């Protein structure tokens, strides 16, 4: 069945439970766009590791064999002292979840991550999130990305 709907989810427990309860017909008609925030801050390192581990494993338990768009929110990058570490953060997260159907998603204007997308070892392509603010420049941005060989439209 063709994709008919792309729900934008914050990956909260209620949303995860709803995805598990969808009928196969409905489930096959959607590809979730998941905005992932960092697990809540914890004063204990082991608590933070447990939360991260739970987050990592949730994708394969909730969405086994199902494609989804994976978007890391800005709070993943807030503590980085070097912007060049941003693509590495995304790469590590994608490797940690180890989901064969994950499709990395980036803001259309996120040149740093888009230019580094070939390093993600991902065979599913990427998703470009287009906001209303970048819509009027869509054509020129995509042309620039194509000229730089950052994207290959299909």
Residue ranges with predicted function:
Residues 1-111:
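Alpha/beta catalytic barrel-like cores
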Residues 87-154:
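Eukaryote-skewed repeat-based solenoidal scaffolds used as protein-protein interaction platforms
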């Amino acid at each position: 069945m063709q994709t008919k709907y792309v729900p934008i989810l914050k990956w909260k427990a209620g949303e995860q439970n709803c995805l598990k309860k969808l009928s196969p017909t409905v489930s096959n008609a959607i590809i979730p766009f998941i905005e992932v925030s960092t697990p809540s801050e914890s004063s204990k390192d082991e608590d933070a590791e447990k939360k991260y581990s739970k987050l990592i494993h949730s994708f394969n338990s909730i969405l086994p064999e199902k494609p989804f768009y994976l978007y890391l929110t800005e709070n993943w990058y807030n503590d980085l002292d070097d912007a060049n570490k941003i693509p590495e953060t995304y790469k590590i997260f994608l490797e940690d979840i180890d989901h064969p159907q994950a499709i990395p998603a980036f803001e259309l204007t996120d040149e740093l991550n888009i230019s580094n997308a070939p390093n993600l070892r991902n065979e599913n392509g990427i998703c470009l999130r287009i906001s209303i603010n970048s819509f009027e420049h869509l054509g020129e941005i995509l042309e620039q990305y194509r000229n730089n060989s950052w994207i290959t439209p299909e």
